[in-house]
């Protein structure tokens, strides 16, 4: 086992603080609408330019092991906030730095670290309740656009795209962000249920110009197994032909004689028909077929349920207003399934999302939920260069998470003002002793840090701005760093999601509390390199 180096009390905290400061100082320059960029060197390709706090934090690794421990703990704050709220990583880092700095001073002056931590925890709980009490529910699309704009560093175009996407697919819908092939940013919305399987034969195409199958008011046969001969299907095919409506077959596969017969019948004009493979694999395929059945009020033809193909009747088939099948996608629009059944299925999937521990499963369940609940929106981010596209995509990702969080828990005034105003909740806290009271005061001072930093990044004097904000008691009165004006931040569209502000504070205080109560640090001793061997014969007389 390698030898370890151990540092105690003041020396340990000094090293740790230096690491915290290096990381936090690099991250906090990105805060606010006038935050600066950070350029990150890549081992290959162009450097990456970003204003995303967590991206900066993840790149920092320090040479000194003890300093690095401090930096990594604060990096954990940014990552945790990013995972839960998707935004607010820079605010969390600034808060953590402020609490650790003040806390370390108090411990060095002889206060009890555990009581300080209790005081910090009491203060944070009071602030969180105050934030929740003052959060406003989002009431219209303009507010969603404002949240998106603020989180995308003042880019109104991104805010507009996000508001449009949320409006079209709802809050349960999936919104994905991709890099565009062009310089323009665009939004594409797929309404209805779409899955990534196309027609099994191009002969099924009804619209030759666009190379796709378009059916109005079709029947849908949902079959779990392969179809290789049509004998057992003849009764249902005849019933569909008599009804005069088109038929879409969704099955594990349609092959050989069955596919050939369907194509021949289609070409001779007697049958409006198309066949596609079922989406997904294994158990997920069963679940997705069940989703399609509920959406279209059909039945999955499955041997598990004891239903044979020859016994299928028209009322077991699904129905929809329109179906489009392309080479690689199938879209079912306006299935006739009952609202209650669809809502029940959505609730079931939401429960599974809560229970699952696998990120992959959660992502797939979210996709299924979106397909049932409303649709999928894709924002394609464009730019002139690859570096610009990547930087913009970072901002769109942040803004997307922020808008989701805003719809979930409501909004608060932005610019660090919500935290500054919530300070009044600390006046009534009862503490057991003076050290706990100091812990509460540490949080009181730390809550100014984000507003101060936003002002400094915008070229103003942080103390002056905070002083002016303190003169007014109105919760939404603040300073707009973009315009340099004081006023009602709700009216000016400077708003933050309550979930982001709350998560940033809770994560920052949690890690900062651990750092303040640290008394010893252990790391491996750096290995001393052995001196190079002397060359043979050097300095020898023969």
Curated annotation (Swiss-Prot):
GO biological process entries: protein refolding
Cellular component terms per the entry's GO annotation: cytoplasm
Catalysis: reaction(s): ATP + H2O + a folded polypeptide = ADP + phosphate + an unfolded polypeptide
Domain of life: Bacteria
Subcellular location(s) of the protein: Cytoplasm
Main localization, broad class: cytoplasm
Keyword ATP-binding in record: yes
UniProt cross-references to Pfam families, sorted A to Z: Cpn60_TCP1 (PF00118)
Gene3D superfamilies for the chain: GroEL, GroEL-like equatorial domain, TCP-1-like chaperonin intermediate domain
Ligand binding (ATP): 30-33, 51, 87-91, 415, 496
InterPro entries per UniProt: Chaperonin_Cpn60_CS, Cpn60/GroEL, Cpn60/GroEL/TCP-1, GroEL-like_apical_dom_sf, GROEL-like_equatorial_sf, TCP-1-like_intermed_sf
Key words, A-Z: ATP-binding, Chaperone, Cytoplasm, Isomerase, Nucleotide-binding, Plasmid
HAMAP family: CH60
Family: Belongs to the chaperonin (HSP60) family.
NCBIfam families in the record: GroEL, PRK00013.1, PRK12849.1, PRK12850.1, PRK12851.1
Role noted for this protein: Together with its co-chaperonin GroES, plays an essential role in assisting protein folding. The GroEL-GroES system forms a nano-cage that allows encapsulation of the non-native substrate proteins and provides a physical environment optimized to promote and accelerate protein folding.
Full protein name: Chaperonin GroEL 4
Organismal lineage: Bacteria, Pseudomonadati, Pseudomonadota, Alphaproteobacteria, Hyphomicrobiales
Gene behind the chain: groEL4
